Amino acid sequence: WTGLLLLGAAALPVTWAAVLAPGGPAVSVSLLIMPIPFVAVGALVYARRPESLVVRRLVAVCAVVPMATAAAVLLERAAHGGDAGLLWAAVMAQHGTVVGFVLAVVGLLAIFPTGIYETPFERAMVRLAALSLLLVPVAAFVNDPLPALKTESPLPPIHNPLAVAALSPLAPLIAGALEAVSLLV
């Protein structure tokens, strides 16, 4: 859990560097500072009660928010003339962090406030949300071009170097599932 929180904290300077470097995307100041309280809250609650399942799930939410922000900023930067490899990686990172955020929130809400699953339905919902995380790597094998989440600027089709042509009939299903998960956010 400490490593996850450190990844979230490391995403902060990545976001700032991508925005503040020459040619960076124009974003609001609130986007740059919004993830800071998430990292601070995650660190504070984890320092106080690292054994608590509720705290660990909250740490996951707090760590994924700055990672998702960094992925979105990197995608905007890559869309403005960046290299295609970075654009592909940024789209996959954005999908992964959005689905990870949904999973972390579902996991937290399922056990809040007691720290245990109170019904089998809650456990089933967390397992279903965890399965949705598998959509991201599956999308890497079936979709070409990759579907991108909505951004400030329209993106050109993003070529996927990992796509397997034989799996392309599954592409609309996976793209729809990724879109459904992103609509939950």
Task: Give residue ranges: language-model regions.
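Alpha-helical transmembrane segments of multi-pass integral membrane proteins
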Residues: 1-185
